[in-house]
């Protein structure tokens, strides 16, 4: 971008200057509207999410057979919700502001198979593709017991097909592990930010890892090119995939059931705020869509990004979406939050969800590490840095009394509020790597 173009953009959107200066910002979205008004722009609806849920139910016997760690939950890939009372007290002190509602954590960080939120969308898209191939070949009926897929016959069949994906780490882990287990030949194109241990875990699972010196966008593009020249290769497109998006969206109805079972109320008098770390946008976008379908206008979804990679905030705030990258403004896209190291947001997610997202904020790597250390010491929960991005959210919301008033949210409603931080990854981080994170955290607190 030319200097004059940047100056023009800053003049039109002063917040962009704050992003360029890498200052942590909070922005509430003036275009946010009701579910009824915003839903038509998504291009998907509750029936699509129900279809995804049914597909996952069909695959539960397969997952149970192929991944023993899912057996206790009968082949359902789901995570628990836990309260964080000690962390809430610690952050009240850290931010000098008392949070009126209750702080909860959604532990997608500890999802089975791949230990991140990507176990939702990534695994779902591979299963949907496998089902399509097996149905077309006449090897499978929708009424079959899908446990039959866990067999030499099906591994041989899927072995004739290839899957490719570009990833900063966690999506590649999910897609690589499930694809290889089914029998596919799978290549994961990894950006420079990807952690070494994630690459090694993939190799240990029989996955072909292709490494790049460049960022996420280049890895995705190369994966796309590989698939384009090979009719038997299926490219999973993190930037544009509706199937991935729907895999994530299933989380909404499941959370509603979890809340019903544990007595967490969500209605006009008991608002729900959900804080989602955002990279390219597919995971948080899909989850937010599912949450809006499940809780309607009583849920407020807020995206969190690193100060060095604020791609979705930039795209939605300016309305340019994937027409602008943080690098165009001289922002380097270098962050320890490897899952969030994305310079250009998904245009599909930005345009689909811009009317259903309440707000966005950024935070520094140093803050993520400090929060990582605090969560470990106060709650004995260990996450990777990017999974902490949602943690300051409740205090950012509480601090903006003007926005709360504009939403018609009063003191009593905020006392009744539930603040859910979506922990996106960290359950499979090796001990040595976690020790490094915690050492960094001690310096950051």
Swiss-Prot record:
PANTHER family in UniProt: D-SERINE DEHYDRATASE (PTHR48078:SF9), THREONINE DEHYDRATASE, MITOCHONDRIAL-RELATED (PTHR48078)
Family: Belongs to the serine/threonine dehydratase family. DsdA subfamily.
Keyword Lyase: yes
Coiled-coil spans in chain: none
GO process terms (BP): D-serine catabolic process; isoleucine biosynthetic process
Substrates-to-products reaction catalysed: D-serine = pyruvate + NH4(+)
Keyword entries, A-Z: Lyase, Pyridoxal phosphate
Presence of the UniProt keyword Metal-binding in the record: no
Positions carrying N6-(pyridoxal phosphate)lysine: 118
Subunit structure comment from the entry: Monomer.
EC class of the enzyme, as a word: lyase
Database matches in Pfam families: PALP
Entry cofactors: pyridoxal 5'-phosphate
Protein name, entry field: D-serine dehydratase
E.C. number(s) listed in UniProt: 4.3.1.18
A GO term for molecular function: pyridoxal phosphate binding
Domain of life: Bacteria
């Amino acid at each position: 971008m030319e200097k004059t173009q940047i100056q023009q953009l800053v003049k039109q959107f002063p917040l962009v200057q704050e992003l360029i200066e890498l200052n942590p910002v909070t922005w509430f979205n003036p275009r946010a509207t009701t579910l009824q008004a915003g839903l038509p722009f998504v291009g998907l609806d509750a029936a699509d999410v129900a279809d995804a849920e049914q597909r996952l139910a069909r695959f539960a016997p397969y997952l149970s057979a192929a991944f023993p760690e899912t057996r206790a939950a009968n082949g359902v890939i789901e995570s628990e919700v836990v309260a964080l009372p000690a962390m809430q007290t610690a952050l009240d002190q850290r931010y000098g502001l008392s949070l009126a509602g209750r702080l909860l954590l959604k532990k997608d960080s500890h999802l089975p198979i791949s230990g991140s939120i990507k176990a939702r969308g990534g695994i779902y898209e591979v299963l949907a593709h496998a089902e399509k191939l097996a149905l077309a070949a006449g090897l499978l009926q929708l009424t079959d017991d899908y446990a039959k897929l866990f067999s030499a016959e099906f591994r041989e069949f899927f072995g004739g097909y290839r899957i490719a994906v570009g990833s900063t780490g966690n999506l590649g882990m999910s897609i690589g592990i499930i694809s290889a287990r089914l029998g596919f030949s799978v290549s994961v194109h990894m950006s420079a930010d990807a952690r070494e241990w994630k690459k090694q875990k993939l190799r240990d699972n029989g996955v072909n890892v292709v490494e790049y010196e460049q960022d996420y966008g280049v890895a995705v593009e190369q994966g796309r090119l590989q698939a384009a020249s090979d009719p038997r290769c299926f490219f999973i497109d993190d930037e544009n995939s509706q199937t991935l998006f729907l895999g994530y969206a299933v989380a909404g109805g499941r959370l509603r059931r979890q809340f019903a079972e544990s007595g967490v109320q969500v209605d006009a008098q008991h608002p729900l705020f959900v804080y989602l770390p955002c990279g390219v946008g597919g995971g948080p976008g899909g989850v937010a869509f599912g949450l809006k379908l499940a809780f309607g206008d009583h849920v407020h979804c807020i995206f969190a990004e690193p100060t060095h990679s604020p791609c979705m905030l930039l795209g939605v705030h300016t309305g340019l979406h994937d027409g602008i990258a943080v690098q165009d403004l001289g922002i380097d896209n270098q962050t320890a939050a490897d899952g969030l190291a994305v310079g250009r947001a998904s245009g599909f997610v930005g345009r689909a969800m811009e009317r259903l997202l309440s707000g966005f904020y950024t935070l520094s790597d140093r803050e993520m590490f400090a929060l990582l250390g605090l969560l470990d010491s106060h709650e004995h929960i260990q996450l990777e840095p990017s999974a902490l991005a949602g943690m300051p959210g409740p205090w950012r919301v509480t601090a903006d009394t003007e926005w709360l008033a504009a939403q018609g949210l009063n003191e009593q409603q905020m006392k009744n509020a539930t603040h859910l931080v979506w922990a996106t990854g960290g359950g499979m981080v090796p001990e040595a790597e976690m020790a490094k994170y915690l050492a960094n955290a001690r310096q950051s607190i």
